Amino acid sequence: MTISNTRPITPELIASHGLKPDEYERILSLIRREPTFTELGIFSAMWNEHCSYKSSKKWLRTLPTKGPRVIQGPGENAGVVDIDDGDCVVFKMESHNHPSYIEPYQGAATGVGGILRDVFTMGARPIAAMNALRFGAPDHPKTRHLVSGVVAGVGGYGNSFGVPTVGGEVEFDARYNGNILVNAFAAGLARSDAIFYSKAEGVGLPVVYLGAKTGRDGVGGATMASAEFDESIEEKRPTVQVGDPFTEKCLLEACLELMQTGAVIAIQDMGAAGLTCSAVEMGAKGDLGIELDLDKVPVREERMTAYEMMLSESQERMLMVLRPEKEEEAKAIFVKWGLDFAIVGKTTDDLRFRILHQGEEVANLPIKELGDEAPEYDRPWTPAKSPSPLATNDIPRADVAEALLKLVGSANNSSRRWVYEQYDTLIQGNSLQLPGGDAGVVRVEGHATKALAFSSDVTPRYVEADPFEGGKQAVAECWRNLTATGALPLAATDNLNFGNPERPEIMSQFVHAIKGIGEACRALDFPIVSGNVSLYNETNGQGILPTPTIGGVGLISDWARMARIRFAAADEAILLAGAPEGWGTHIAQSVYMRDVHGRTDGPAPHVDLAHERKVGDFVRGLIADGLVTAVHDCSSGGLALAVAEMAMASGIGATIEAPAGHDPIAAFYGEDQGRYVVTVTAEKLEAIASRARDAGLSLPVIGTTGGSAVKLGDAKAVSVEELRSTHEAWFPTYMGGDLAPDN
């Protein structure tokens, strides 16, 4: 059914477009008349949270975004960071949460496709992908279906496109029952002097449509992504886009080939709000108007209206401002790759966004007010409240060995092999570390020694307990995971997933998490260069756990010295860098409390950023000098889980002493921050100990590698074979239709 552009504008229609009454009044004052139906759709798309960041912009400005290596920070399709030798890494993380809940395969697949386009739009060839996934409780009736669809979608698109998936996260919690999270990360390599931007320059230049044809899929997708769900969720299935990775691969090659010709003045991928957002952003950034003739847009469906064409989120499409003299050369490239190439408009000097369709003007709007001058809110938020500490006598006991087996086989700590074996982790032939370690590592092609490390991290239960400390911890753990490979952390991207910002308690979570993220990034010289905000992650008023995911990139100057988590050999000393007295103290909000005792009370662990930096720099120095044989950061599950993971990765056991006079539960399962487990050969032990003394760092020897079991203090030994079988069993058992007991 076609929709007339003269459809009456009623309060119900305005509300259905996600516009508040005061926002509609602002529209009337801007254009001094009633908008057409197409214009209402354009305002709805550009003024929603997904495109305008109207609730978050104020706080995003407080984040550190500059640094000596930063070539491009937030505001472009992706961030760009210098990695020496004239090379740069281009990267970003973005959410596709709402579509993936409604239609998990296509939602996840097009999330991958969208983030890859963000990267190659800048002129970079994608070299790595990650995904951070959050699902509802394992026993929820939709969870297994959603896991299956999302993982298949991520793999189906990424594998076909030809980019290795080198890391990510998968976590379950009942708070995601009605609103899962799919956060997709991509990184690419480019030359520092060949970066392409979205700012249009020059009047009267052709605006060119590139890629696949436009259909009705995804119409209204950006508006849907800016609202919480209710019982009408199934009706939103048509707003989910459909992806074709093979077309995207052709689009990548065509764009990179075109970029070498000097034809491109500005280029923008068509993501959220499709043709509308890409055209408005290009024009508004360049202080230019844009005129589009929709009769020239390649379409794959009949009788498409102006409203549908402007708001379609059909995938694998680009918009470009072209040098006129290069038109035939550019067209030939896209024809060769089997893609559409159509001049659909021109740049103008009047700062108007003008849309023509079938000989009529269907929209004529001020472009700056649609783009970078959209509404901005300073939403109310409540002061932070920190939970009371747990009393010493309120820490429940459990057998240390039995707790370890329970944790390694639990829903949230078990092996993710079932997931990542569905992804191509080796394509392109440059992967050096695969999922399952602290960070994925990819060799920089064409360079003998250089590699890049990638990690994504957040601990939502910490953010829920204390958004400020949780925000700090997300950054610190990402930085720590990169460091644990030997990489120098360069910069980060954020994917900020929260509930309804109109609720002051949710806005408070957001504000304090941003403050924590900013403080940590400044302390660790880890600027935020790109990112995404996803709000209204709620269903029927039930919000998700606050989940500000941090994706980070680090540089390894010599990958031959790169560290791994697996024990290298028997009879090596195990040390705990950055250990507090007693090795571990903070048991509140730990997975021990959550998964063994079903409790999520108490404060999040404090992150001492000066300590974090000092210990991380020290460990990175040990790795660079070849003094350690294995490294693993201590995070969820504490020392016990870190040692178990190192043993399972290598097949070599470990004996850990219990710290005299200290609680073994806190020592083994405490989640104190800023710690690394390292292993050292006997002949290098004294040299490392001397370094630690000179640096004023705690570096106790806590045990020895060897044997076929892991023994923690006085607890019974658990064989590595039993740990492995328990660790590997949960996911395939669950996905096979049997819910593992007690999880």
UniProtKB/Swiss-Prot annotation:
Stated family: Belongs to the FGAMS family.
Descriptive protein name: Phosphoribosylformylglycinamidine synthase subunit PurL
Species: Sinorhizobium fredii (strain HH103)
Pfam families: AIRS (PF00586), AIRS_C (PF02769), FGAR-AT_linker (PF18072)
Function text: Part of the phosphoribosylformylglycinamidine synthase complex involved in the purines biosynthetic pathway. Catalyzes the ATP-dependent conversion of formylglycinamide ribonucleotide (FGAR) and glutamine to yield formylglycinamidine ribonucleotide (FGAM) and glutamate. The FGAM synthase complex is composed of three subunits. PurQ produces an ammonia molecule by converting glutamine to glutamate. PurL transfers the ammonia molecule to FGAR to form FGAM in an ATP-dependent manner.
Residues that, per the record, bind ATP: Y53, K92, D494, G531
Assembly with partners or alone: Monomer. Part of the FGAM synthase complex composed of 1 PurL, 1 PurQ and 2 PurS subunits.
Keyword Chaperone: no
Location(s), subcellular: Cytoplasm
SUPFAM superfamilies: PurM C-terminal domain-like, PurM N-terminal domain-like
Annotated Mg(2+) 2 binding sites: D118, D269
Reactions this protein catalyses: N(2)-formyl-N(1)-(5-phospho-beta-D-ribosyl)glycinamide + L-glutamine + ATP + H2O = 2-formamido-N(1)-(5-O-phospho-beta-D-ribosyl)acetamidine + L-glutamate + ADP + phosphate + H(+)
GO cellular component: cytoplasm
Residues annotated to bind Mg(2+) 1: E94, N532
Pathway the protein takes part in: Purine metabolism; IMP biosynthesis via de novo pathway; 5-amino-1-(5-phospho-D-ribosyl)imidazole from N(2)-formyl-N(1)-(5-phospho-D-ribosyl)glycinamide: step 1/2
